[in-house]
Each structure stands twice: as structure tokens, then as C-alpha cells.
Amino acid sequence: MPPKKKITAVIKLQINAGQATPAPPIGPALGQHGVNIMEFCKQYNAATESQRGNVVPVEITVYEDRSFTFVTKTPPAAELIKKAAGIEKGSAAPHRTKVATLTREQLRQIAQTKLPDLNAHDVEAAEKIIAGTARSMGVTITD
């Protein structure tokens, strides 16, 4: 078995799927760790091509020899809620001003999408987590 590479950094970014460019914020974040920025952009864009239009978080692990690996996550819950509700942004005063409503069915779809990245064991628990995020954005849930 080959010796393990030593990890020097773990970088977390949220980038639009298929639209990674060396411009900020990606360039400076990777450049300070000596990563080949164009190589990352090409690999990320290829990996997220099917998810265009979504913000896809990525966790980049940088090794001692300046090589890297990355893992893409599911889009943020807030982004999925905004897309499902058809709104630009959440409420400025979420508990006073409601900006949209979601049905239980939409909530279940978002929960199933996010399930791999949430610390929930079943869809019901994931739904509660997503409902809490929606509530803090000024989005109400209807049955």
C-alpha cells in the first residue's frame, strides 16, 4: 500500500455549477495553497455540468505535493427553497413578513435531495430540518 499523502488544507467553496473560473473567489482561495486553478476549474465544471443553474458546494482537499481531490455536495437548502418557492431572496424580517409558501410535497422533494448531506436518518427528520430553514427565510409550509 502506498504511503498516505499529507493533507495541508481543506477548502470549502460554493460555486455555480459548470461556471467555475479562475477569477475571485476561486482563484485566490486555491492560489494561496499552490493548487493548479485551471485544472480544478476544468474538473469541477465537468463534474457539475448536469446541475447547471444550481449553486453546488465543493470541499477541496489539498495535499502536500499540491495535488488535490474534491467532493461536491448537494445544493444549499436555502437555494433549493428559493427555487421551489420562486423567490429571489428570503424575507428581511422572517417572523413578521412571509414571502412565500411551500407545500408538504415540495418540502419532501427538497428533503430527499438534501438527505445525503444532512445528519438525518430518515426523510421525516430531513423535512423538519428543511422546514426550519424555510421558516427562518420567511417561507410558510402548508399541508
Swiss-Prot record:
Modification comment: One or more lysine residues are methylated.
GO biological process: translation
Name of the protein described by the UniProt record: Large ribosomal subunit protein uL11
Record's keyword annotation contains Ribosomal protein: yes
A Gene Ontology term for the protein's cellular component: cytosolic large ribosomal subunit
InterPro entries attached to this UniProt entry: Ribosomal_uL11 (IPR000911), Ribosomal_uL11_bac-typ (IPR006519), Ribosomal_uL11_C (IPR020783), Ribosomal_uL11_C_sf (IPR036769), Ribosomal_uL11_CS (IPR020785), Ribosomal_uL11_N (IPR020784), Ribosomal_uL11_N_sf (IPR036796)
Assembly and interaction partners: Part of the ribosomal stalk of the 50S ribosomal subunit. Interacts with L10 and the large rRNA to form the base of the stalk. L10 forms an elongated spine to which L12 dimers bind in a sequential fashion forming a multimeric L10(L12)X complex.
Lineage of the species this protein comes from: Bacteria, Bacillati, Actinomycetota, Actinomycetes, Acidothermales
Family, per entry: Belongs to the universal ribosomal protein uL11 family.
Gene: rplK
Protein keywords: Methylation, Ribonucleoprotein, Ribosomal protein, RNA-binding, rRNA-binding
One Gene Ontology molecular-function label: structural constituent of ribosome
Function noted in UniProt: Forms part of the ribosomal stalk which helps the ribosome interact with GTP-bound translation factors.
SS bonds (residue pairs): none
